[in-house]
Curated annotation (Swiss-Prot):
It comes from the Bacteria. GO terms for molecular function: rRNA binding; structural constituent of ribosome. Coiled coil: none annotated. The gene is rpsE. Part of the 30S ribosomal subunit. Contacts proteins S4 and S8. This is Small ribosomal subunit protein uS5.
Length: 189
């Protein structure tokens, strides 16, 4: 049986198809300097958020002497560290959640259909690439894009699907949904 060579044309086409499902957004680009004996060497640092708009999202950081190379490195880094976030009705969060990183703190709240993405700066890029359509987000503390993105990811990692909550509590999913509807936190459609 003949083995295909690594890096063959078919492999490249499959990689391009896999990569085409992702949407990437450039969040921040900074000029950075490395001090060497002869002076300063300037380069660029990029922060990129990547997602499939179906619940998977990741962020990456890349540095290089040229902007396009920094963006490429950041995009590759983001694709390696994707997380899955369960969405209610494919559009919003299941419950309100807090996240923090360093001095950056965020509060993410689920929203009614038609609300849109009410979020500032770097958080908006995360929600758009995630595929979330309705969310209200508030950031406090540090407005550094790196801290805001990491705090947003911290909050999203704490998002739990109601089926998992029901399993932990030893309840049936339908019972949990009935309680949610009775308390007024059910689907608002």
């Amino acid at each position: 049986m003949a083995q295909e060579k690594r890096g063959s044309r078919d492999d490249r086409q499959n990689r391009e198809e896999r990569d085409s499902e992702f949407v990437d957004k450039l969040v921040a680009i900074n000029r950075v300097a490395k001090v060497v004996k002869g002076g300063r060497r300037f380069g660029f640092a990029a922060l990129v958020v990547v997602g499939d708009q179906k619940g998977r999202v990741g962020f990456g950081h890349g540095k290089a002497r040229e902007v396009p190379e920094a963006i490429r490195k950041a995009t590759e880094s983001a694709k390696r560290d994707l997380i899955f976030v369960p969405l209610r009705d494919g559009r919003t969060l299941h419950h309100d959640v807090h996240g923090r990183h360093g001095a950056g703190k965020v509060l993410l709240r689920s929203a009614k259909a038609g609300t849109g993405i009410i979020a500032g700066g770097p958080m908006r890029a995360v929600f758009e690439t995630l595929g979330m359509h309705d969310v209200v987000a508030k950031s406090t503390g540090s407005s550094n894009p790196y801290n805001m993105v990491r705090a947003t990811f911290d909050a999203l990692k704490h998002q739990v699907h109601p089926k998992d909550v029901a399993a932990q509590r030893g309840l049936k999913y339908a019972t949990l949904q009935a309680r949610r509807a009775a308390s007024g936190n059910g689907s608002e459609e």
